[in-house]
Every structure is written in structure tokens, then in C-alpha cells.
């Protein structure tokens, strides 16, 4: 029988990375909110770790957003590590493609509770609890931005290691990837009980035997990253049973909203309906939202939506003064997927094949 313990698994913090797909205004509270979003998300990771009294936080790569990490981002990261350390939480980290080992770093001292895996070989570090080994954590970092080798094949579990955790920043998408490509079979062959992966920004549990988990990123950054973002709280029982709980950490959420235009004949009616749904969305998520509005269906508004001027007018009407709200819901894009209405009676009168098809449908009416 082993020892019960728990940890937070997060990855891809991308501290300081600016949002894409949105133009920030020159004034209003949202400028500051967007600028601090990635930092606030990591604060919420540490909050969750402290509130749940976990034994460790595992960070599986890409703490920063590039080889040259800003000093402010490094100081903010160190500040949160010290906060976790004060709560008795151990930190285990591997470097990824956005924060490789050779990247510049300021000489900022980190707590003794921070363990960073080297890039030269897979190493193991015990996770201690109450003076006893609760688990063994294996990991390897990126030395450079691109790693074409299959690093998963370098992991080998040792005997008597208790619960074994592997940490790797990897792309399971294909052998030609420059981001430590591997397969699920490669990971399973290492004999780990839990794989704490990073690199993929959408959370995904690849396997439950053993657990192979991507937590996704902690804060959405663009329209490609729709929906809740966060980390996993992982509870490991005395007999090695694993329980996952997803914890939302994003402070601003990217969302899709789909509207069928069939019920509306006037632009003002559509704007009113969207505004009403926006209010419900704010209440549902409890945080600011950046929204892609997708219009579908058919009706009189198809002509408005099919023109760029029409779409711009709707967006401007929806966003008027919204940037001055703390709990904003900003429509960043309007996608027209509507179609023109079809009048079957008129079509039947056409002499060509366009009219013959609806004529043939009369027998079903």
C-alpha cells in the first residue's frame, strides 16, 4: 500500500503572451484585464493548490511565451512560486519549446521547493510527504526550441518507485513534429502510472490506463481556444487509484455564440436578441467574455449579413460602450453562415432545372 497524496497538473502558462484576434481599445478597464490575464490565471492555479492543500504542483512546460522572457513575467512567476512554497507545496517543472533551457533568464532566486528537470537526460526526483516517499517523478526538459527526438523512449520506470509520474512537453500529432514527437504506445511502454504532459492547449485525457493527460493551457489566447481553460487537481489514493477534477483558471473566456436569423426581419431585432443572450452568458461564466458571433439560417437579414458594412454595423452596435465595463462581453468577430430564402412558388415557375426540381416535390406535399 502506498501513500495518499494529491497534486495540481498544469502546463502552457504563456505568461505575458498578448491576446490574438482582438484589438484593444485605448481606454477602459479591459486593457488592464487582458494584459494581466495570463498572470491572474497562474495565480488561480496556486490558489487552487493552496485551497486543496496539495502536495505538489507539476508544470509541464511553456511557462513563458518565447526565448526572451520579460523580467516582469519572471518576477511574477517567482512571486507565485514563493507563495506556493509558503504553503508547503513542492514545484516540479520541465521546460518546453517556448521556454527552453538555453533561453535567457534573470538571476532571480527561486524557493528550494522548486525542482527543474535538466535537458541532458531523464532524471527522477522523489515526492516526499510526512517524511516518506509518496511518488517518484521523472522528467526531461527542452534544451532548445526544437526537439525532434522522441524523448518518451528515454523514460524507464525503476523498481520500487511507488507511484510513478512522467513529465514531458510533447506533440503526439506525428513523427515529423519538432516538439518531441511520440505515440501513446511510447508513453505506455515507460511504465508510468500518470503522464503529466504539456504542449497541446486543449485539455485531453488520452488514456486512463495509465493516465496520459494534457491539461490544456491555463488561459485562452485566441479564437482557436474556445471555452474553459485551467488545470487538473489529481488525487492519488493509497492503492494508486487516480481521480481527476478540472479546475477553471481562465479570467477571460473566449466563446462562440450561434444565432439563427430565421425569426428576425429587422437588424434591430437581431441585435436585441444577441444582447439578451450576452447578458445570460456573463451570468453563466461569471467572467469577461470575448465572443465570436456565428449567424446561421435564412431570412431577410441574409442580405445585411452578407455585406461587410452590414456586419460591421452589427458589431459596432453590440460593442458600443462595452469596453468600459469590468465584466465585458466583447464581440470580436461576426461570421456569416446564412443563406438566402427560397420561395418554392417562384422557383417552380422557372423553365430550367432550377424550377423542375421543386415541381417534382409537389407529389410529397
How would you name each of these model-derived features?
Residues 4, 53, 133-136, 191, ...:
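Short loop/turn motifs at secondary-structure junctions
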Residues 60, 198, 296:
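Conserved residues at the C-terminal ends of beta-strands
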Residues 1-30, 229, 235-260:
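Domain-start "cap" segments at the beginnings of catalytic or binding domains
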Residues 1-74:
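N-terminal active-site segment of His-dependent metallophosphoesterases
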Residues 249-365:
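Accessory, non-catalytic peripheral segments of nucleic-acid enzymes
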Residues 20, 26-28, 56, 67-243:
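His/Asp/Glu-rich metal-coordinating catalytic cores
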Residues 39, 43-50, 75-78, 152-156, ...:
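Amphipathic, non-transmembrane alpha-helical secondary structure
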Amino acid at each position: 500500500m502506498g501513500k495518499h497524496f494529491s497534486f495540481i497538473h498544469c502546463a502552457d502558462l504563456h505568461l505575458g503572451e498578448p491576446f490574438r484576434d482582438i484589438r484593444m481599445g485605448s481606454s477602459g478597464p479591459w486593457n488592464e484585464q487582458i494584459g494581466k490575464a495570463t498572470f491572474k490565471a497562474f495565480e488561480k492555479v496556486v490558489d487552487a493548490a493552496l485551497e486543496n492543500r496539495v502536495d505538489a504542483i507539476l508544470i509541464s512546460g511553456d511557462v513563458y511565451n518565447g526565448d526572451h522572457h520579460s523580467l516582469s513575467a519572471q518576477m511574477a512567476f517567482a512571486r507565485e512560486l514563493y507563495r506556493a512554497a509558503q504553503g508547503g507545496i513542492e514545484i516540479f517543472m520541465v521546460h518546453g519549446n517556448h521556454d527552453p533551457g538555453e533561453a535567457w533568464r534573470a538571476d532571480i532566486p527561486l524557493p528550494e521547493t522548486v525542482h527543474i528537470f535538466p535537458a541532458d537526460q531523464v532524471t527522477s526526483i522523489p515526492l516526499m510527504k510526512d517524511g516518506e516517499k509518496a511518488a517518484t517523478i521523472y522528467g526531461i526538459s527542452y534544451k532548445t526550441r526544437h526537439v525532434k527526438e522522441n524523448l518518451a523512449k528515454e523514460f524507464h520506470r525503476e523498481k520500487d518507485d511507488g507511484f510513478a509520474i512522467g513529465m514531458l512537453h510533447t506533440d503526439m500529432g506525428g513523427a515529423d513534429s519538432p516538439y518531441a514527437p511520440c505515440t501513446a504506445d511510447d508513453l505506455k511502454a515507460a511504465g508510468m502510472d500518470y503522464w503529466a504532459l504539456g504542449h497541446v492547449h486543449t485539455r485531453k485525457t488520452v488514456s486512463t490506463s495509465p493516465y496520459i493527460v494534457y491539461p490544456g493551457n491555463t488561459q485562452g489566447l485566441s479564437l482557436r481556444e474556445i471555452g474553459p481553460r485551467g488545470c487538473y487537481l489529481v488525487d492519488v489514493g493509497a492503492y494508486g487509484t487516480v481521480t481527476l477534477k478540472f479546475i477553471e483558471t481562465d479570467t477571460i473566456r473566449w466563446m462562440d455564440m450561434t444565432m439563427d436569423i430565421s425569426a428576425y426581419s429587422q437588424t434591430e431585432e437581431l441585435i436585441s436578441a444577441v444582447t439578451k443572450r450576452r447578458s445570460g452568458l456573463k451570468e453563466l461564466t461569471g467572467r469577461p467574455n470575448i465572443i465570436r458571433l456565428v449567424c446561421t439560417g435564412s431570412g431577410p437579414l441574409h442580405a445585411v449579413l452578407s455585406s461587410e458594412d452590414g456586419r460591421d454595423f452589427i458589431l459596432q452596435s453590440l460593442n458600443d460602450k462595452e469596453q468600459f465595463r469590468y465584466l465585458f462581453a466583447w464581440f470580436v468577430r461576426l461570421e456569416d453562415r446564412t443563406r438566402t430564402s427560397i420561395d418554392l412558388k417562384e422557383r417552380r415557375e422557372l423553365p430550367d432545372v432550377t424550377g423542375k426540381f421543386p415541381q417534382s416535390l409537389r407529389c410529397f406535399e
